[in-house]
Amino acid sequence: MISIEGLSKVFSLNKKDIKAVDSLTLNIENGDIYGVIGYSGAGKSTFVRLINRLEEPTSGKVTIGDQVITELNKNDLRVARQDIGMIFQHFNLLWSRTVEDNIGFPLEIAGVDKQEKARRVKELIGLVGLEGREKSYPSQLSGGQKQRVGIARALANSPKVLLCDEATSALDPETTNQILSLLQDINEKLNLTIILITHEMHVIRKICNRVAVMEQGKVVEEGQVLDVFTNPKQLVTRKFVEQVMSSNEDSDISTIIENYPDGVLYRVHFLGETTNQTLISQIAKQFSVDLNIIQGNITQTQAGSYGALVVQVTGNESEIERAKSFIESQESVELEVIQHAK
């Protein structure tokens, strides 16, 4: 487990103290893909650099396993960093070295013999899907391929933790999804703990199981990704959730009521395991009502789906009431009546 207690970083600028990270406390379990999200200036990149002491903390404590990272001397820290891999937004590759030489560089520094280094590099090239690119230079690679080299290099010493600082921010959407899928695959194969820094909620949604939301150097909200999606408490969190939900339902409701005056209007919220397709199909088969899906958005997280549909239900009043009771009886579904039958 990674334990972070009261971690702070203060920078002095023009004789003023600026708290980039302010008394941050988190616990991250082994094997987690843990997302940290925030807008520019929230302190998230400073925070991740405090974990491996690329930035020295002003105060606080970082413990990884049974090692207190913040108390290590320089020599012990150098050894401990072999268990902490890191990838960056702009790849940080050595441009005069080939793919295989970039990946093997940490092994070279660690004094690994040539035969073992060659074996490990070949293994990593296969893991990240770069077969055939061994002799290529960074200038000959796409952005996604460069990041794959960065990931392989970060894994060279078989770390227990991988820090990802905006690792997909410089990539197009399709390549971003490919890199996220690769990270998820590596997490599952190696039981690697991943801490992922981002300003994009769809990155959190796609692969993270827990998330911390940072604002002005502090964690303002933290929890399971699905819980944060379904019940965001802070304004900054709601803004991030809107990135992936793209919902303007509230502003449209008056128009919907005006355009669909018949029957009943429900907003049905789906949480976790229940799928909208299954529920709507069951209602159509079991009850003598007509269903009209007017508006909706469903998104997937690692823990299940989340979203809402606005549905018009018309038919016999007793059948509408039976359908309503059926919806309310379902687990992981919440029903909100927007407009009663006239």
Swiss-Prot record:
The lineage of its organism: Bacteria, Bacillati, Bacillota, Bacilli, Bacillales. The complex is composed of two ATP-binding proteins (MetN), two transmembrane proteins (MetI) and a solute-binding protein (MetQ). One of its GO terms (cellular component) is plasma membrane. Keywords: Amino-acid transport, ATP-binding, Cell membrane, Membrane, Nucleotide-binding, Translocase, Transport. It comes from the Bacteria. Its main location: membrane. Part of the ABC transporter complex MetNIQ involved in methionine import. Responsible for energy coupling to the transport system. It comes from Oceanobacillus iheyensis (strain DSM 14371 / CIP 107618 / JCM 11309 / KCTC 3954 / HTE831). InterPro entries: AAA+_ATPase (IPR003593), ABC_transporter-like_ATP-bd (IPR003439), ABC_transporter-like_CS (IPR017871), ACT-like_dom_sf (IPR045865), MetN_ABC (IPR041701), MetN_ABC_transporter-like (IPR050086), NIL_domain (IPR018449), P-loop_NTPase (IPR027417). One of its GO terms (molecular function) is ABC-type D-methionine transporter activity. Pfam families: ABC_tran (PF00005), NIL (PF09383). ATP binds at residues 38-45. SMART domains: AAA (SM00382), NIL (SM00930). This is Methionine import ATP-binding protein MetN 2. It catalyses: L-methionine(out) + ATP + H2O = L-methionine(in) + ADP + phosphate + H(+); D-methionine(out) + ATP + H2O = D-methionine(in) + ADP + phosphate + H(+).
